[in-house]
Amino acid sequence: MQYSHHCEHLLERLNKQREAGFLCDCTVVIGEFQFKAHRNVLASFSEYFGAIYRSTSENNVFLDQSQVKADGFQKLLEFIYTGTLNLDSWNVKEIHQAADYLKVEEVVTKCKIKMEDFAFIASPSSTEISSITGNIELNQQACLLTLRDYNNREKSEVSTDSVQANPKPRALTKKSSQSKKKKKAFSSQKPGQSKAVQYPSDVLESASVELFLETSKLSSPVVEQIIQGNDSSELELTSVVENTFPTQDIVQTVTVKRKRRKSQSHCALKEHSMSNIASVKSPYELENAGEELDARFSKAKPMCNTCGKVFSEASSLRRHMRIHKGVKPYVCHLCGKAFTQCNQLKTHVRTHTGERPYKCELCDKGFAQKCQLVFHSRMHHGEEKPYKCDVCNLQFATSSNLKIHARKHSGEKPYVCDRCGQRFAQASTLTYHVRRHTGEKPYVCDTCGKAFAVSSSLITHSRKHTGEKPYICGICGKSFISSGELNKHFRSHTGERPFICELCGNSYTDIKNLKKHKTKVHSGTDKNPDCSVDDHAVSEQDSVQRSPLSETLDVKPSDMTLPLALPLGTEDHQMLLPVTDSQSPASDTLLRSTVNGYSEPQLIFLQQLY
C-alpha cells in the first residue's frame, strides 16, 4: 500500500531539521551569510553540489558572491526543501543567476519563462496590445478587430497613393444592395480631396491604438448588432468612426501626445483607458512599464505568510523570515556567537569593546543601545511608561517587561529546562538555571576574582567594593546595595514574614533565616528540595516579586536579570546589557571576558563592522 503524502511528509521533516540545524552536515557560506543544509538533499537537486561532494568531504562550501547572491540562494534553498518557488520582478534575476551557477535546471527553466513574461510586459508592441487586455469584454474585442482592419485598409491606401472608390473594412463581410449604396455615398470623395497623405508607420500604429481606445466609448447596442451580423450596424459604426476621427485629426493628436508624453504622464489617453478598459495600459504608459510595475507592487506592503506581520519594505520581510527559519548569518568573530540581524551583531560587539554611543542628556550616562536609553529615561527621569497591565493597571517602561509581568497573572511558563523539566517565565531565568546544572560562572569580579552565574549578581557584588548603596528606604532613609536587601529591610516595618517552614509552620522575613532554622531544628529531617541552597537566587527573586514593595517601587535596571544577548524583535526591545549607575564600575569592565588584545583577523572584523 502506497501512502500518497509520504514524500511531502519526508520533505517537510527535512526542512524542519534544516531550520533547526538538526543533523545538518554542511554549511554554504556566501560572504558573511551562512546557510546550514544536508549534503544529500543539495546533491540531489544541484549538479554543482553533486560534483563537489563526490570529490571532497569538507563541511563548508564557499560560493562567490558575484555569481550567487545570498537572497537568491535562500529562495533556491527554500525551493529545494519545500518545492515552493515564488518569483517576482524583484528576485527572479538573482534566483536565475544562482540556479544557473549551481545547475538546478528546473529552476532555470521556470525563471526564463518568468523573465520572458516580465520582458513582454515591460515592452509590448502595439500589435500585441490585445494580448495585454486579457479580460476585455466581448463588445470591446469586436471594436478592436473592426478598427484594426479599418486601419489596415488606410495603410494600403497610403502605400498605393490612391483613394479607393468603395473602401470597406474586411471584418464587415456581409453585403446588401442598400449598404453598398450607402457605403459608396459615404466613402466617395471630391477631386480636391483625393490626394493621399503618407504618414510614418509608427504613427499609424499609434493611431490604431488611439482609435481603439476612443471607440470603446461607442454605444453597446451598435457593437452587439455588428456581432450578430447586421449590415446596417456595420455601416453605422464605420460612419461614426469616420466622422468622429478623421485621419488627419488622428495623426495630429498622436503626434502632439508623443511630443508631450514625457511631461504629461497622466494624459487623456490614460483617462480613456482607465475609465473604459480597467485592465488596459496604453503604449505610452507601458514605455517604462518595469518602473511602473515596481512602483505599483511597492504600494502593496509585504506580509509574512507565517505570522501575518506586515512590513513597509520587502527587505524588512526577508530579514524577518530569518527568525522563522532559524537563519543566523551574522557571526561575531570574537566569540563565535551568531545573530539574525546585523544590528544585533553590532550591539553584541559592544559587550567586547565597551562602546556606549547613546548618552543621556540629563545625567551623562552612556548606553550600548538606544532602547536602553529610552528605558533609563522612563525609569529615572519621569518620562511616561506607556505599557499598562490590563489586570492590575501597573505601568512599565518596555513592552517586554509588560509581557513578562503578564505571565504572573496567566501562570504561563514557556521556557523549559531540557535536563530537569523545570519551567520558567523568562528566558534569562532558564539560562541562569541551566548554569546551575553546568556549573558555569562567566562573570568574574576584577577586584577579588569571585565568579558568578548571573550578571546582576556581579553588579551587586561590585557595590561592596565601591560602597555604593542606590536603594533607599522610603520610611527610615536607610540605603542598601540591592533591591532584595531593601525589600528584606522593608519587612521589618511591615511585619511581613513570607518564608514559612513547611515542617513546623514558623515564618521568617529572610530565606537565610529559614535555612538556618531548618539546619538547627530540623537537621535530621529530609530537606525539601524546593528549599535547597541551589534555589537561593530564585527564592530571593520570588521574594522580590511577592513583596508589596515591588508594587510601589520601580525595579532598577541593574537588577533586571536579562541575558547578554537576546533576539531583538520589532516590538520587544529587550535589553542586551544591564544598566548601572555612574559610580559603579563600567558594565563593559564587569561583563567583558578578560582579553589582553585582539588578533589581526578580529581587528579586521571590527573595522569592517563599523
Curated annotation (Swiss-Prot):
Protein's name in the database: Myoneurin
SUPFAM superfamilies for this protein: beta-beta-alpha zinc fingers (SSF57667), POZ domain (SSF54695)
Coiled-coil stretches: none
Basic and acidic residues biased stretches: 523-539
Organism: Mus musculus
Main location: nucleus
Keyword Translocase: no
Entry GO terms, CC: nucleoplasm
Keywords attached to this entry: DNA-binding, Metal-binding, Nucleus, Repeat, Transcription, Transcription regulation, Zinc, Zinc-finger
GO MF term (any one): zinc ion binding
GO biological process assignments: cellular response to leukemia inhibitory factor
BTB domain: residues covered: 24-89
